[in-house]
Design a protein with these regions (language model features):
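Generic structural signal of hydrophobic/aromatic residues within well-ordered alpha-helices
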Residues: 22, 33, 40, 56-63, ...
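Acidic carboxylate diad motif detector
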Residues: 53-155
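Positively charged, helix-rich recognition surfaces that bind polyanionic ligands
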Residues: 5-6, 16, 20, 78, ...
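Generic N-terminal simple sequence motifs
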Residues: 10, 87, 98, 376, ...
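Stable alpha-helical structural segments in soluble proteins, enriched in small hydrophobic residues
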Residues: 36, 83-94, 349-359
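Long, hydrophobic, amphipathic alpha-helical segments used as structural scaffolds
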Residues: 37-44, 91, 95-102, 168, ...
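Gly/serine-rich nucleotide phosphate-binding loop at the start of the catalytic core
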Residues: 1-79
Length: 409
């Protein structure tokens, strides 16, 4: 049985003494991160010297023995070591042009600690962390192998979470044999090739007036005052409610898709570029990237085939019946009639059907941009997919290693 790596995130409820202790630990790791980042930046700026986490780890041992820094010894050693390793990974991502330059951490932002090799602390559904004791969780620990690493975090609203990764057996479900194309949009979050339109909940837009009021109230509070801190937490909780509602809706949609369909075709959108253009707030509120991310890992978990169609394929301009392509289609034109076969199309439903057809054709090596067929000779995507899988079975060759996403184009 194949295994997959699954991540877990559980709500934690530390008591008063544990919260005070965690506050000191968060401050220590934040100080270590900022100090190490300042040393590395200054060393490269002045001497062109690139320091590593191992260099700073040796200095950390000396800092613990230096007068005025003995409080570092109160923090679990693994938490401090992992802090330096996280900074190493941040610099690796920067040098590989995946992320921007590491930044200094603020006191009011998200705080986290990482514990390695917790040993007997993982037993009988109870989590016991070094120097902290038993930590109360909102639910019992899953019955999985003891993880190598456990992270404890606190968000801006003051909520605590425990997260870890574990290998679990893949729970593949029997295929339904159904195929679907999914066209993402702002008026409707998702339009299926079956004709169903899923409305866009617009979680952020619906709460925007309340959020603006709370932000204005925060701006009027005096910096450093107790009332400002209370208002800051109120604003953070309001944003957390929006984020949780969005996540719940996306999980419900993606779970339904992977359970009801065996093949899912979506467009490989450049979400980052869309988020910088016109309507950026609405696009970020819709969370196209998060929806695609959930479909990717859930397709690997449960078995459906996820086809990602080339973003440059004009799915809205092709007739899904005869494959005729319009020269021009305005964005405000939601319906159009094919001049060749006379079919009246809903723009989004037609795009979803074309995404499914193009995904299956590209999987079969028959790109629709190079293939033109008449309406009577059009091969349905279900029949074409059956032909592809049958040819793979006869030849012993597979276009994919297993269930999961396949990027096309």
């Amino acid at each position: 049985m194949s295994l997959i790596t699954r991540s877990y995130r559980l709500r934690a409820y530390p008591n008063g003494a544990q919260r005070r202790l965690l506050g000191r630990w968060f401050g220590a790791t934040r100080w270590l991160w900022n100090t190490a980042l300042g040393i590395r930046s200054e060393a490269y700026r002045t001497c062109r010297l690139s320091l590593t986490g191992n260099d700073l780890s040796r200095w950390l041992t000396q800092w613990k023995r230096t007068a005025g820094h003995q409080w570092l010894a109160e923090v679990p050693a693994t938490a401090l070591t992992q802090c330096l390793r996280d900074q190493d990974r941040a610099f690796s991502g920067f040098f590989a042009h995946r992320t921007r330059y590491p930044r200094f951490k603020a006191k009011r932002g998200r705080q986290s600690l990482r514990f390695q090799d917790i040993g007997a602390g993982w037993r009988s559904g109870v989590l016991r962390l070094p120097k902290l004791g038993v930590l109360k969780l909102a639910e019992e620990l899953p019955e999985v192998e003891r993880p190598d690493m456990v992270s404890l975090s606190r968000d801006a609203a003051g909520a605590y979470f425990v997260s870890f990764c574990a290998e679990v057996p893949r729970t593949s479900r029997p295929g339904t044999g159904e195929l679907v194309g999914v066209d993402l949009g702002l008026t409707h979050l998702a339009t299926l090739s079956t004709g169903e339109k899923i409305p866009n909940p617009r979680h952020y837009q619906r709460r925007l007036r309340y959020l603006r009021q709370q932000h204005r109230c925060l701006a009027r509070r005096q910096k450093g005052s107790h009332r400002r801190e209370k208002q800051r937490v109120r604003v953070a909780r309001a944003h957390a409610r929006v984020r949780e509602a969005r996540q719940y809706a996306l999980h419900a949609l993606t779970t339904r898709l992977v359970r009801e369909f065996s093949v899912i075709a979506i467009e490989d959108l450049n979400v980052r570029a869309l988020g910088r253009g016109r309507g950026a707030r609405a696009i970020q509120d819709a969370a196209f990237g998060e929806l695609r991310r959930q479909l990717r890992y859930k397709s690997e978990w449960y078995g459906p085939l996820l086809l990602e169609v080339d973003r440059w394929y004009a799915s809205s301009k092709h007739c899904s019946m005869c494959r005729f392509r319009l020269d021009e289609l305005r964005l405000d034109q939601r319906q159009w009639r094919c001049p060749k076969c006379g079919t009246c199309h809903d723009r989004d439903i037609n795009a979803a059907r074309n995404l499914l057809t193009q995904g299956v054709r590209q999987l079969a090596g028959r790109d629709d941009r190079d293939l033109r067929v008449d309406a009577g000779d059009a091969c349905p995507e279900e029949q074409l997919l059956v032909q592809v899988l049958a040819e793979e079975a006869r030849s012993g060759h597979h276009n994919r290693a297993g269930p999961g996403p396949v990027r096309l184009g």
